[in-house]
């Protein structure tokens, strides 16, 4: 089923979903299963699987020189999606990126998704590489998420990039996109950012999942302004529990989000990461309860490869 069909079938009941990241090369997929297993009791209708873009590494050539190589540290997104779909009988949502992929490579991945019965995808621009000042698309790739959405929507209409053919089995992808309650870090204003979101929806996006936030008022204001701009698709809140002290620094730095003073003060009073983790769980529980009471369609959790805190939260909310 499509994500939007799951939402419609729930008839106003808030659903539970979460996002996982592929293991690094050389690690076992069993690690993923071990993190997914405790969360299945909450009956997620779908699970997101991230995609990592290529990055540069330096390999010792053995003569005092280093070779700069392009590699992907966490491949396997589509294989993991197929494996989870088969093992747990749950829909999966692979993330598709503009960065690091040509339009042709994107089309081939979409064809694979279609053959595997995967009919939900998340369309994202992706981040700049570590040695780039700003995002640079791969030659022949999509520049923006709206362009990627348009390409997927073209395939839904039976139109391939270069081939003219009779299509008797069209794809029918449900397309998710990202929304930013505190605006994208590159956007000059929230209004400008909402215009970009409207472009993605107009290009064919079916639902929105927000970046993490820690103040529900910002989500509610974001939804209000999105509706005023004519964005009518479901807007799913994304929740990330604080887990370690360094989150106070790196989350605002990386995602350009604000942390409430009450949360900062609570974390700073903690003596160790176990206490911080519990503060994060309790904060996310209160966020989730309020959002659920407001009738959000889905509560979507960013697990970052760890499920115990998500399980604790879900046990108090669902």
Residue ranges and their predicted role:
Residues 1-49:
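Conserved N-terminal beta1-alpha1 strand-loop-helix module at the mouth
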Residues 15-33, 91-104, 174-192, 268-282:
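Active-site mouth loops of central-metabolism enzymes
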Residues 102-114, 192-196, 221-224, 244-247, ...:
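Catalytic cores of alpha/beta
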Residues 126, 139-186, 193, 224, ...:
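Active-site pocket-lining/capping segments in soluble small-molecule metabolic enzymes
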Residues 19, 47, 113, 200, ...:
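Conserved, mostly hydrophobic/aromatic
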């Amino acid at each position: 089923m499509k994500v939007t069909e799951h939402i419609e079938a729930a008839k106003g009941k808030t659903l539970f979903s979460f996002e996982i990241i592929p293991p690094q090369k050389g690690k076992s997929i069993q690690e993923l299963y071990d993190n997914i297993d405790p969360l299945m009791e909450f009956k997620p209708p779908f699970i997101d699987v991230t995609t990592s873009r290529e990055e540069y590494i330096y390999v010792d050539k053995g003569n005092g020189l280093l070779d700069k190589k392009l590699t992907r540290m966490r491949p396997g997104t589509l294989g993991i999606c197929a494996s989870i779909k088969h093992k747990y009988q749950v829909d999966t949502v692979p993330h598709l990126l503009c960065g690091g992929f040509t339009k042709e490579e994107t089309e081939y991945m979409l064809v694979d998704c279609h053959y595997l019965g995967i009919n939900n995808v998340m369309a994202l621009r992706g981040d700049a590489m570590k040695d780039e000042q700003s995002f640079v698309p791969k030659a022949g790739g999509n520049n923006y998420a709206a362009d990627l959405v348009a390409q997927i929507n073209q395939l839904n209409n039976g139109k391939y990039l270069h081939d003219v053919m009779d299509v008797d089995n069209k794809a029918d992808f449900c397309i998710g996109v990202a929304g930013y309650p505190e605006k994208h870090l590159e956007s000059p204003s929230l209004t400008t950012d909402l215009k970009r979101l409207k472009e993605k929806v107009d290009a064919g996006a079916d639902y929105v999942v927000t970046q993490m936030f820690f103040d529900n008022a910002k989500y509610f204001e974001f939804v209000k302004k999105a509706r005023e701009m004519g964005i009518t698709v479901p807007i799913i809140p994304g929740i990330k529990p604080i887990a370690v002290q360094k989150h106070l620094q790196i989350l605002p730095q990386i995602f350009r989000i604000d942390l409430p003073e009450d949360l900062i003060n609570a974390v700073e009073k903690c003596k160790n990461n176990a206490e911080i983790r519990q503060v994060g769980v309790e904060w996310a529980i209160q966020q989730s309860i309020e959002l659920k009471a407001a009738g959000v369609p889905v509560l979507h959790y960013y697990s970052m490869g760890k499920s115990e805190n998500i399980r604790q939260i879900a046990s108090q909310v669902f």
